[in-house]
Amino acid sequence: MSNLSFAQREDSSYVMVCRGGGIWISRDGLSEYNQLTDRRVYPDVKGRFEDPVIWRDHIQYHLIVNDWLGRIAFYLRSKDGVNWVTDPGEAYMPGVAVHEDGHSEGWFKYERLKMYQDKYGRAIQANFAVIDTLKHEDKPFDNHSSKNISIPLNPGLLLTVLNDKPITAGTKTIRLKVQAEEGFHPQTDMDISSLRFGASEEVNYGRGSKVLKTENDGDDLIITFDGKGNGITENEFAPKLIGRYKNGKMLYGYARLPYVDYVEPILSARAPVFSESQKGWNGNIEVQNFGQVSSQKASVKIEYKKEGKMVKVASAAVPALKPYEKADIRFATKADFEKGEDYNFLVTIYSGKKVLSTFRLNRKVVE
């Protein structure tokens, strides 16, 4: 593996992303890393991906990955560091190094991104390796060069949603507190009429909830938004504020939702192992909780795909598991596996009818 990037979780464990886009977790950063994903978490587009960088702030996990051939990077967000959503647009591309006076640095390629964070975990500075031509055209004693450059970032605002009940399409009003910081005074620095709040899919395109009124709260500002058009669904974990400062520059920020659990169990299964006896086929499968809190009882189902249809192999109960605890689950199956045939297995872990995780693998049961 290469191009590894790490973020520390709340319990001091670590989540890691590798160049291939797999997500791994280690209990302390020194013990073994276990891969939880069976496919890359990057956007489902063609690209030569490398140099992923992952970090966690007080709201969520962030991930940027670079397509070195296309010279474009993508930005993803996650509640738990395992399941990711991709934001539209580009995280960066040639032309992003622009000074306050308008001068633009014409670097050909930006790579090896690293983030400098503040005490909240917010990214406040991006460090890049840059070059002004193709690598193989940068020769000794020529006029080309590569450098390390640092670009200051807009860290985003500190926001708190004050609604106690879940926000839906029917929510009448949304109350949001904007916290004052050194150098930022929300009561005087924001263009209030420009503010929009809601799901990223809405506010990124100029939609979202509009301001109804504001009220001062010490040095902070409480903004009441009309709930109409917020776009927040049951899967939302970090709604977004976007708008302008009075000086015309962009402002933004993410907020947590007070009714969402941000630290949950993360159940993951290993590949099932089968053995044949006189009575038929038996199997066992290991399920481990990589979450930071205990899990409830769950279930696991094993299937394989044949002629376009899913064939059930077995299902079994998964006991409640403490953080990092594992269970070896045994089962019997009426399935009859053929010698030399490849099986496309799907392992699904459920909590009731809710899918917690899936794991796909292709393997022969009988050589």
Regions inferred by a protein language model and the residue ranges of each:
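Intrinsically disordered, low-complexity Pro/Gly/Ser/Thr-rich segments with frequent PxxP/GP/PP motifs
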Residues: 309-338, 349
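Short acidic/proline- and small/hydrophobic-mixed sequence motifs that coincide with surface turns
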Residues: 292-298
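Carbohydrate-active catalytic/glycan-binding domains of CAZyme proteins
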Residues: 1-160
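Asparagine-centered strand-capping/turn motif at beta-strand->loop junctions
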Residues: 286-292
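Low-complexity, acidic Ser/Thr/Pro/Gly-rich terminal tails and inter-domain linkers that flank the onset
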Residues: 152-165, 260-280
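Structured beta-strand segments within beta-sheet-rich domains
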Residues: 203-254
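Short, solvent-exposed loop/turn segments enriched in Ser/Thr/Gly
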Residues: 170-175, 191, 234-239, 278-284, ...
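Terminal connector regions
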Residues: 243, 334-367
